[in-house]
A protein has these predicted regions:
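Secondary-structure capping and boundary motifs in well-ordered enzyme cores
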Residues: 110, 144, 148, 205-208, ...
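Acidic, metal-coordinating catalytic cores used for nucleic-acid/nucleotide bond scission
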Residues: 253-262, 280-283, 397
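Conserved nucleotidyltransferase catalytic core and NTase-mimicking acidic/glycine-rich helix/loop elements
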Residues: 409, 413-439
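Dynamic "connector" segments at or just before major functional cores
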Residues: 1-179, 183-191, 213-225, 444-470
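Electropositive, glycine- and tryptophan-enriched low-complexity nucleic-acid-binding patches
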Residues: 204-245
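Short amphipathic alpha-helical "interface-anchor" segments enriched in bulky aromatics
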Residues: 363-391
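An anionic, glycine-rich sequence signature occurring as long contiguous blocks
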Residues: 207, 224-227, 270-369, 433-470
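Basic, amphipathic alpha-helical segments enriched in Lys/Arg and hydrophobic/aromatic residues
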Residues: 393-416
């Protein structure tokens, strides 16, 4: 009997979390049903005729939340509810990273800035719709900022460019490896003078701006953004951007179209390090001997050769097999010849990188592969700019818009770096949005926490009580 009671006690303590157990008082017990916890009071009465106490059905008290027991009559008195869990995660990260910097540089506008940056992470809506998202999140309960289109537009025009540059410089840590890449963003806005015809890899003849981004390879984090007229895309602009950011160790990570002897000489004259992929028919590629070693990348083996004439050679066996298979299919379809196969077989699965870095081959490979994260970040800008073009009345507003989106990306990558790939950042924020805060007539009560949301709260170590103290 005692052993059974002990097992019941241990099971009870293991299945009910500590925050719910604190509401277990004399005569009150907590029951776990699904993903929720409910409080009941034991009841009994003395039966005089039988001279014994008779147990009665328990009295239901209400749902157990982190803020207390919500009675049935209180639930009926809910005035409104707000998305809470996603705000708790983003605001908590912001408090540890960008918020102290914003308070220092923009002491009167940091509240509106951080609201905009957080809301862009939850859902990248056009500026005209941000207010409606703001009003359904808990941000509107802890902030008295107006997030109307007019207030956001006013913020874009009033943030001094030199102060925004100061914020970005503070986000770049001394001594870390920083990658630089650039891209063209197209728009038909008639208000922005930076929009000019220019060269781009897609050979699209549309007005464009050039965007240069610095990306911390050490922390996998975007840290600096600069916009330039569409016709400017040269090495001098890269050097000036690095000087503006105050970066010590920067590597230009280019695409295949960037390579030319002239561009490489310009980089060397400016003392800029570089990693440039070479086309497979480049005359700079040395004859490969026996491979030097193997390292693992993204769960796959990668072969590498000894660096020769500043050229690093790599081979992905999985990609090699896929390329060979594709080529053989083309031969069978009479789209390629066996002679072409023999000429190209040596290049299957190969990657050739030209770099002045004197680093281990694996290090150079990983630096180059981080370009994928930079491209990921650029896509956010390309997808969002057109929706807001009517609000961007001049070059200064465009710069501020890009700056604020960089801060939004900074928070995005903070989350990306701590999740294990099971969920995307958007998935994480959506799952956490199911944690609500209910506003009652005289108080606030947090909702029950669904299982997936609870798992993320524990994994990401989210402090759900933090915003309640604001």
């Amino acid at each position: 009997m005692y052993l059974y009671a002990w097992y019941v006690y241990v099971y009870y303590m293991d299945t009910i979390p500590a925050w719910a157990l604190k509401y277990k008082t004399r005569g009150v017990y907590i029951r776990n049903v699904g993903n929720n916890y409910y409080a009941y009071r034991t009841r009994s009465r003395w039966v005089k005729e039988e001279k014994r106490t008779k147990t009665l059905p328990p009295e239901y008290l209400g749902v157990v939340t982190r803020n207390g027991i919500v009675r049935k009559d209180q639930v009926m008195g809910i005035r409104s509810d707000y998305e809470y869990g996603n705000i708790a995660l983003l605001y908590g990260i912001a408090e540890r990273t960008i918020l102290p910097v914003l308070k220092e540089v923009y002491p009167y506008l940091y509240g509106r800035i951080i609201n905009y940056v957080i809301l862009r992470n939850i859902q990248p809506l056009p500026m005209k719709s941000i207010r409606y998202l703001y009003e359904k999140t808990y941000l509107s309960r802890i902030s008295d900022e107006s997030m109307s289109p007019a207030s956001i537009s006013g913020m874009l025009s009033s943030l001094p460019e030199d102060r925004s540059i100061s914020v970005m410089r503070k986000l770049t840590e001394k001594g870390e490896y920083v990658l630089m890449d650039s891209t063209a963003i197209f728009s038909r806005s008639e208000n922005i003078s930076f929009l000019e015809p220019g060269h781009n890899p897609k050979e699209m003849h549309l007005p464009q701006i050039n965007v240069m981004m610095l990306f911390s390879a050490t922390r996998t984090m975007p840290t600096f953004i600069r916009i330039l007229p569409g016709s400017i895309r040269d090495v001098s602009a890269m050097a000036n951007t690095i000087d503006m950011a105050g970066v010590e160790k920067c590597v230009i990570v280019a695409d295949k179209g960037f390579f030319s002897a002239e561009n490489v000489n310009k980089l060397r004259k400016k003392h800029l390090s570089y990693i440039i992929p070479l086309r497979r028919n480049s005359s700079l590629i040395p004859e490969p001997d026996h491979f030097m070693g193997v390292f693992m990348y993204d769960g796959k083996p990668v072969k590498y050769w000894k660096r020769e004439n500043d050229v690093y050679i790599y081979e992905d066996p999985v990609l090699k097999s896929e390329e060979e298979k594709d080529y053989l299919i083309r031969i069978e379809e009479n789209k390629r010849s066996r002679k072409q196969f023999d000429e190209n077989e040596i290049n299957f699965g190969k990657l050739y990188l030209l770099s002045d870095l004197n680093e281990e081959p694996e290090r150079v490979y990983r630096l180059y592969k981080q370009r994928e994260y930079v491209e990921y970040a650029f896509n956010v800008y390309k997808n969002d700019l057109e929706a807001d073009r009517s609000y961007l009345r001049d070059d200064h507003m465009l710069f501020t818009y890009m700056f604020l989106n960089l801060l939004s990306l900074y928070l995005h990558f903070q989350i990306l770096n701590i999740i294990d790939g099971k969920y995307s950042v958007r998935d994480v924020l959506l799952i956490l949005s199911r944690i609500k805060m209910y506003r009652m007539e005289k108080s606030e009560i947090m909702s029950e926490i669904p299982k997936k949301s609870r798992e993320l709260v524990e994994k990401l170590e989210i402090d759900l009580d933090m915003l309640c103290k604001k």
